[in-house]
A protein has these predicted regions:
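Helix-boundary capping/turn motifs
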Residues: 70, 95, 390-391, 613, ...
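Soluble C-terminal extramembrane regulatory/interaction domains of multi-pass membrane proteins
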Residues: 177-181, 185-202, 245-368, 553, ...
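A transmembrane helix-and-boundary motif of multi-pass membrane transporters/channels
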Residues: 1-233, 240, 350-607, 709-724
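Long, compositionally biased charged/polar accessory segments in the mid-to-C-terminal portions
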Residues: 580-628, 634-637, 643-644
Length: 724
């Protein structure tokens, strides 16, 4: 007979479970000594707040307490005034939950926990208090005290006893992101593999692997941005580097469209000239050498100045018999994007050094305000649908409760509110709700054992610890494993929630079964209403993300076509709005990748590669906004207006093919710039770079621009701008 194999738990998992259980028992002890009516609320709170990283525990503690305070205050204000009108009270509490849920979905960071908790806390306190509104204030105060004790104990134990800092996690993700960006740049700068001049990177690279690497980089940037929300709460010196980390996120995000643009410009040069020309190959080799020396810390200012001179020389290429106007335009665009990469990489290196200094206790330098998380993709329509589903589910349970006079109908409304909120960020929350329900059903026998058998036999605190330890310690071990977190949390939530809702001294089997039926009914109602109102497929969600991108591109071009761009110098340095668009597009790429994979790797009308193209497009439109004074006014307005019209029609589903007139307008504007005498200025080169990018992104299969279209034309001279 084979030996029974027991799971092996790591030291970190054992430490996490032990700290969580110790915090739970401390909270239970303090709540009992204080005479609070439901001390198991404190126990449940310690596990809800628990996290392997101390910084995440502290931030969740702050957010949870604020949400609890807001929710309990709303309950005290609403329930007494409406206790004599149960139908109206149910509607008002449902609307409150829906409003808070909608607000929470507008913030895709852990801060959203405040609003979500404010919503369902009102349901957890308000609905059970309907039958005794005179005791509502005392009940609300008791819940805040019990939850506050749980938060305090969890924060204390996880912060003081073997605290797990966020440094390895955050810095590991940060360095992996930098390494991926550096690898991408290194791939682009590889020298030609043979005399034909064809770069080695295109000869031996797997396109699918490269595409996966690009999408992983986008996902890592967004994940880092969300995870860094916890950094100011960390227990180590890492918290002093929060500003540098946020600034570095913005810098890496801004590098991505430039990396993608360089890759496309090299491909275009190879297609136009048959191979990478010697002058371009020499520049790539010089840039690659500088990058290697910069990474090794051996680069000096002379090497950087020499590289800048080479970039300037390529950008100043004059037309001759061997270089066509299109080849010249591609060289100007390539030089401009490589210059961005060089300066951006140097900024990233400085910020990484500042972070290392901050970890040693040095005061980090003051940073320009980062973009933060406000620029992440938001789907307001889905947020409103999620709120509507929560309102309808609560009203359905409330109507059944009122019509039947069911004594435990409050449990159904509570569970409907909680489960509609928990899974609102998913495209289709129903499978997750059903999975949670399955494990909640498995928790019922354990809850019955505690409520009906074990707890009535407990006569002192030592016995309580001994009774709780086996189940809660084991579930805590599995909570520390990401693969088992959801089942363990569902079981723990089911057991501790049942204990919190019952008076364990007077509970009987009838009240227990009644309460369990109410909870199950509420979860089923949440799943039913969500499936009817809110569930969508991955393909539907991916198309919404793509249409949001097209609408934003139309707005960017339309704003430029309507009014002159008047960005302040500080705004130009921060890269607003172009850098904000880059962050949002990287977030969308990270959102699209799993949805395309979930749909079997293919969604009609949605290609993952198109997202990178749209990312470059936004950078080019933003650059053209800044330097539009370099173009004749009529030409700039007509071009940007056509681009805005095209993307608005595309977002509305009214056009699929790119109009040939748009290609003609781009070629006309590009010809005027190449034929002008002012192409030596930074703004003029930026205009050429943006126009080349628009042509390549909108018409990648179009033949090179004809030489005959390039004629000298007068172009207004503008003040020097920021080179893009």
């Amino acid at each position: 007979m084979p030996a029974l194999s027991l799971p092996r738990f790591s030291r970190a998992e054992i430490v996490f479970s032990t700290k969580s259980f110790a915090a739970a028992m401390l909270a239970m002890y303090l709540a009992s000594r204080a005479g609070l009516p439901r001390p198991f609320w404190a126990l449940m709170t310690t596990y809800v707040v628990a996290h392997p990283l101390a910084g995440a525990v502290r931030s969740k503690a702050v957010y949870r307490f604020c949400g609890t305070l807001i929710g309990s205050t709303a309950t005290v204000l609403l329930v007494p005034a409406l206790s004599n009108a149960p139908e109206l009270l149910t509607l008002v509490l449902a609307l409150w939950v829906g409003l808070c849920l909608c607000i929470s979905l507008f913030d895709r960071t852990p801060r959203s926990y405040v609003f979500m908790l404010a919503g369902y806390t009102a349901a957890l306190i308000g609905f059970p208090s309907v039958q005794a509104p005179e005791a509502l204030f005392d009940t609300a105060v008791a819940r805040v005290e019990e939850i506050g004790l749980g938060i305090f104990c969890a924060t204390l134990l996880h912060s003081l006893v073997l605290p797990a800092g966020m440094g390895p996690t955050v810095l590991g993700l940060l360095d992996r992101t930098l390494q991926d960006a550096r690898k991408w740049l290194g791939d682009l700068l590889q020298p030609p593999a043979s005399a034909t001049g064809t770069p080695a990177r295109r000869a031996d690279a797997d396109p699918r692997r490269l595409a996966d690497d690009r999408r992983r980089l986008a996902g890592d940037i967004t994940q880092l941005r969300i995870l860094s929300t916890h950094v100011p709460f960390d227990t180590t010196h890492l918290r002093w580097t929060a500003g540098a980390i946020r600034a570095m996120q913005d810098r890496v995000a801004a590098l991505t469209p430039a990396l993608s643009a360089v890759e496309d410009r090299l491909l275009a040069l190879e297609q136009a000239e048959g191979a990478i020309a010697p002058d371009v190959a020499a520049l790539l080799a010089q840039t690659g050498q500088w990058l290697r020396e910069e990474g090794a810390g051996t680069s000096d200012d002379a090497r950087l100045q020499a590289l800048r001179a080479t970039l300037a020389a390529l950008a100043a290429t004059r037309p001759d018999a061997s270089i066509s106007p299109w080849g010249r335009a591609l060289r100007i665009a390539l030089a401009g994007r490589l210059e961005e990469l060089v300066e951006g990489w140097r900024a990233c290196a400085r910020l990484r050094a500042d972070i290392d200094d901050g970890l040693k206790g040095a005061v980090p330098p003051r940073r320009v305000a980062a973009l933060g998380n406000r620029v992440l993709h938001l789907d307001r329509g889905m947020a409103l649908l999620s709120a509507l589903a929560a309102v309808l589910a609560i009203c359905l349970c409330g109507a059944f409760w009122i019509l039947t006079g069911w004594s435990m109908g409050s449990a159904a409304t509570m569970m409907a509110a909680v489960f509609c909120c928990f899974f609102a960020t998913m495209d289709d929350p129903v499978p997750a709700i059903q999975g949670f329900l399955k494990w909640t059903l498995w928790s019922i026998p354990i809850s019955a054992l505690y409520v009906l058998v074990l707890l009535p036999l407990v006569h002192d605190f030592g016995m309580l610890v001994a009774v709780c330890a086996p189940v809660f310690m084991l579930l805590g071990l599995y909570m520390a494993r990401p693969a088992y977190f959801m089942p363990a949390m569902a079981l723990l939530f089911g057991v501790s929630g049942t204990l919190a809702m019952h008076d364990t001294a007077t509970a009987d089997i009838v009240s227990f079964i009644n309460s369990m039926l109410g909870q199950v009914f509420g979860v089923v109602a949440a799943a039913f209403v969500t499936r009817l109102v809110r569930s969508v497929g991955a393909d539907w969600s991916a198309r919404r993300i793509q249409r949001a991108t097209w609408r934003e591109l139309g707005e960017m071009a339309g704003a430029a076509a309507a009014t002159p761009v008047t960005l302040s110098p500080s705004a130009q340095r921060r890269g607003v709005p172009g850098d904000a668009y880059a962050v949002r597009m990287l977030d969308r790429i990270g959102l699209l990748a799993p949805r395309i994979a979930q749909a079997g790797g293919r969604i009609e009308g949605v290609a993952a590669d198109d997202a990178l193209r749209d990312l470059r497009m936004g950078a080019d439109i933003d650059a053209l906004q800044r330097v539009r004074a370099q173009l004749p006014l009529a030409s700039a307005s007509a071009l940007l207006g056509d681009i805005a019209r095209f993307f608005r029609q595309r977002a509305g589903g009214r056009v699929a093919a790119r109009p040939a007139s748009l290609l003609a307008r781009i070629d006309e504007a590009l010809a005027s710039m190449l034929g002008a005498a002012s192409t030596s200025s930074a703004d003029a080169r930026s205009a050429v770079t943006a126009l080349v990018g628009l042509r390549r992104n909108l018409f990648p299969e179009a033949p090179p621009m004809r030489a005959a279209s390039v004629v000298p034309v007068p172009v207004p001279v503008a003040a020097q701008g920021v080179s893009r």
